[in-house]
Amino acid sequence: MRQPKIIVVGGGLAGLMATIRVAEAGVPVELFSIVPVKRSHSVCAQGGINAAKNTKGEGDSTDKHFDDSIYGGDFLANQRPVKAMCEAAPGIIDLLDRMGVMFNRTPEGLLDYRRFGGTLYNRTAFAGATTGQQMLYALDEQVRRFEAEGKVKKYEGWTFLSAVMDDSGVSRGVCAMDLKSMEVRTFPADAAIFCTGGIGAIFARSTNSVVCTGSAQSALFQQGVHYANGEFIQVHPTAIPGEDKLRLMSESARGEGGRVWVPKKSGDSRPPRQIPAGERFYFLEEWYPKYGNLVPRDIATRAIHNVVFEMKLGLDGEPAVYLDLTHIPRETLDRKLEGILEIYEKFLGVDPRVEPMKVFPGMHYTMGGIWIDNQNQATNVSGIYAAGECEYQYHGANRLGANSLVSCIYGGMVAGPASVRYARGLDKGCESVEASVFERERKRQEELNERLLRQEGSENPIAIWKEMGAWMTEHVTVVRRNKDLERTDAKLQELLERYKKINLSDRTKWSNQTLNFARELYNMLILARVITLGALARNESRGAHYKPEFPERDDANWLKTTRAMWDCGSIKLLHDPVDISLIPPRARRYDVAK
């Protein structure tokens, strides 16, 4: 019996879990990561991971977790996979605990849980404020065990360029580039699982790592893989402003009692500690008394925008609000939030234990991503699977805080075995594919590199990237207007024309970051158009997608998944009905209990 082979692209939580599941099935895995695995963006996840264990006796259940997730996502998520994820979540926590993740515990020794946005229950297990790091390190230890046994081979410092497709449109492997030697190679595989994370670089400044470009998703899209719900971009309400990039201030700060406020008087320039409580506007608590500072992220973000831009109550002219932890005991802050407080203190030079933090919304997450089916994390292209933030399945129009980590782990747990079943069911594996198929793709990618290196143009790729980011951030984040979306798409097409005249400052063939960035830039521009066109088409407001011209949710016309496809060099949009068989849609309100 032939031995199949699986490739996993991406070394974050979803990629590592998929790798573990494939290796457990006895199938060899090649794991590709653009950075060392422990530097994958999952390491930046702070607040925790959701599971309805009900250890605090509040009456929580997996059904309530499921309802909160569908309701929080404004009913746009297909319901059966979300239900399966919520039912699997308690077992995932137990698995991670056995792997050695250092979750916080109560004095009795039980796992501790905190409350996050969009729920009234303490449902979020956490490891201080560095939950992603602890989980990533624990999973990598398991992968390294398989690596020592020869079941896993890592390719760190390699970037994915394209899938290798045979003449019938089936994926037979990947083409990748070594970022040191710039060598382009093809790697045969019976199936490939893509766990390539977020797309923050499309918006220039975001809370994402700089390697989160969406380039892999875009490359697959241009090879025929469908992309779903691209228009749904999560803007986190509490990011730490920065000139170079944004840094996240976790929702856990509010989960532990942090309060968001601004001075009631516009232009009040007094230091925050000198402003009496009666002169502070705790707007989230006033507008949403049931959920307070833990309303879902899209609602909190729009509220902050309203306070700053419409009511003109920013902090002394700055687009910012206060996130106040100064009333919380120092011991509690150091035990539960030390990691994120150190980040704020390091970059802004202010101790948030004694002075309120200045925060403002920033691009954080994409609910949209690669289209996958409801059962196997399989795309529309045979042999290609996806898991984690790069796919669209679990969060609908708005992700609840701490659902991302559980969706990463669950997606990897499903994709791994599904890819093994597919590979074992093939009549002919990748070893039977003619060598010319792989050589053809390798040569195509080599020629693209050579063309970029030879190009004698006048355009700077960094300047094009900054323009793209500025337009996307201004027009395709919190508030969308059709005329602005039309202008943005026209600008993106102009940037694509200018891209044809780029000039690379580095023409060497060793560790050429400029070449890799130029390749990624083209893919980012294509994916930016997918996002913008999806937003332009959707004439309603749902979750993170808000249009003042169409302020209401429109279930009659838009309770549909946007599915983008690449059609001979142009972007075509389809709209599929959403599975609402388990929970009928209802009005989404957070000013009162559900």
Locate the predicted segments by residue.
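Beta1/beta-strand and adjacent pyrophosphate-binding region of the FAD-binding site
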Residues: 1-14
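Glycine- and aromatic-enriched mobile tails/lids
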Residues: 1-4, 21, 25-27, 31, ...
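Core beta-strand elements of the Rossmann-like FAD/NAD(P) dinucleotide-binding domain
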Residues: 2-4, 182-191, 380
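Conserved N-terminal glycine-rich FAD pyrophosphate-binding loop of Rossmann-like flavoproteins
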Residues: 35-68, 234-237, 244-248
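Short beta-strand to alpha-helix junction loop
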Residues: 77-87, 125-141, 155, 206-214, ...
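Conserved redox-cofactor binding core of oxidoreductases
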Residues: 98-183, 188, 195, 239-250
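Glycine-rich loop(s) and the adjacent beta-strand/alpha-helix scaffold that form part
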Residues: 191-247, 315, 395-418
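An anion/pyrophosphate-binding glycine-rich loop and adjacent beta-alpha core
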Residues: 219, 226-346, 350, 418-424
